[in-house]
Amino acid sequence: MRLLLVLSLFFFFLIDGYSQDTRGGDKDNNASRSKNKIGRTLLDDSTKIMYGMNTTSYILSSQLLEGDTNFTQVDSSLNNFEKFSIFEKKKMRFQNLGNLGTPLEDLFDRTPKFFNVSSGFNSLDSYYNVIRNNKFYNTKSPFIDLELILGGKGRNKVDFLFTRNINKNWNIGFDIHRIASDKQIGATKTKGDRNVNSSAFNFFVYHQSKNKKVKLFSSFLNFSHQVLGTGGVDLEIQDLPLEYFLYNDSEVRLSKVENNDKRKNYNVFFEYKLLKKFKIYANVEYYTQNISYNDDNLSLNVLYYDSILNDNVVTADSFKLSSLRNRIGIKGSIARIEYNFYANYNLLNYKYSLDSLKSNINENFIGGKLRFKKDKFSVNSSINLKTNGNYEFIGKINNKFFDGSYTSGLYNPNILENYYNGNHYYWSNDFKSKFVNKLSFSVKVDYKNIFFSPRIELVSINNHIYFSNSKIPIQNDDMINYNVLGFDLKLGLFNNLIKFENEYYYSIVGESSKEIIKVPTHHNYSRIYYTNKWFNNSIPIQFGINIYYRSKYFGDAYDPVIQNYYIQDSFRLENYFRTNVFFLMQVKNLRIFAKMTHFNQFDTYGGYFVTPYYPGQNKVLDLGFKWYFFN
């Protein structure tokens, strides 16, 4: 915390000095400023109260790239503030390894996430993407956003943001993010036996010229995520379902192994308005990713591995990737139709530690986006076309009565699916592109204090690639079909003092696909809470419960060597029902929560598995604070 305060003070005075120096440098100006010092001080004192959440807004870098110009006011709501992990923010629609900051897999969306070729080491992408999509601020005053999570059993999280406007046209700032989680199973000491160490630093600059013809942003992101793995609880399949969960007293399957995912991103965006409704732009992004898996205890962990190919003493596998992405484009509007047309070039190279030479991939594609919007009705479409014939089309329609979307595309295999060279696995494939069709539709009924939205999603994938039970990639030649039905429900009761929110998924997997797509049939997440304002309507509060239910299924397992999830059919994850009880309060710019996670674990040795061999978080008290500072 001292380091954060020192850094914020340093940047504050550095920028404050710069902004003062640029107001004028001659002696007459200095004298004039001296004469007006008292009056200006009085003005400053009288206007301090003006700065706050109503005067502070931001825009995302992704919005700027697409041509959106709307700034969003900083969040001051208590809703869902108690959810500090991505796992909970996504309403537990993911698998993880039972701890804050561990690798994630989406339960219901098995379609490709990238049109560009990616590394395939994507289980930590959610943590990276939260930081990568920069927020550029219009602050009117210096602004600090501090979020501190003090989780029980050695789980902590800190997010610190400092930003300020140098003047009306320039904004500068930095983010610091930190996750530190102790092991929840197989710890060798009561405190400080780390499972996750994650840190990120992001520096950003945003500029808009006085005549609003030029927009520029630039950012540098340094991301480092370390997982000190355990391999999960050491048990025999015939002992399932487990009656006693020993957590930190458990024997684990791996000792002293380490995964590292280090990424850097340099991004520069430039936009120039040639005509009132016509702009040209360029975006350049340099990205690196360094992946490693280290096991210095190979002789003790040997039973975990299916094979050892090169070194019988230690495993020191690594993978390095770098890419230079360029986009140039035009965007504007004609009547109510907004357009964005662009060309992309991506030069990518990669190398495993056992390779003698780097491999290169050149990607070229063109694309375009169209958007029509009138009142609450909008239509969006986008298409990307690669030189090799692959494509991606996305269409969306939204209005007050229904939402619909359709996605169709041919996607290249990622690097990991096609090629891997390490101490425990080797493969070299020439997989075909994956074909995806996805149709989603939902109806919205919004009447007084009731919102109800039934939905359906139909997914077909041809040439689907997955990691088999032997932890190697396989391409399925047949068409895979699975459907997800469900609904969202929101109720306000007793003049909205009691609120109920519910999200339900019902999954239907085709008979020929059940051995490949493993999802729970039923998945439900509810939030029931009391909301009011105490102390003369000055302090908003919420008190309630989160309820999570997942039906039994053979969930995907996780392999730290390839840092990916793979299918299995021997370890069944049983039905489980979990509740969290929370209390939230807001005092001016300070928000506070207290939450009893896994409240319904009344037996110390009770529990459930969230992923094969990895128990879900046991009962623990979590505390959190989020504080905005202005001026």
State each model region's role:
Residues 4, 9, 19, 141, ...:
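Exposed, low-structure sequence patches enriched in small/polar residues
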Residues 12, 129-135, 529-533:
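Intrinsically disordered, low-complexity boundary segments flanking structured domains
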Residues 91, 95-109, 299-305, 319, ...:
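Structured extracytoplasmic
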Residues 103, 115-118, 129-134, 173, ...:
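Short hydrophobic/aromatic-rich motifs at helix boundaries and adjacent loops
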Residues 130-131, 157-160, 253-254, 313, ...:
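Short structured motifs
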Residues 194, 204-206, 212-269, 289-301, ...:
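Flexible loop and strand-edge segments within Gram-negative outer membrane beta-barrel domains
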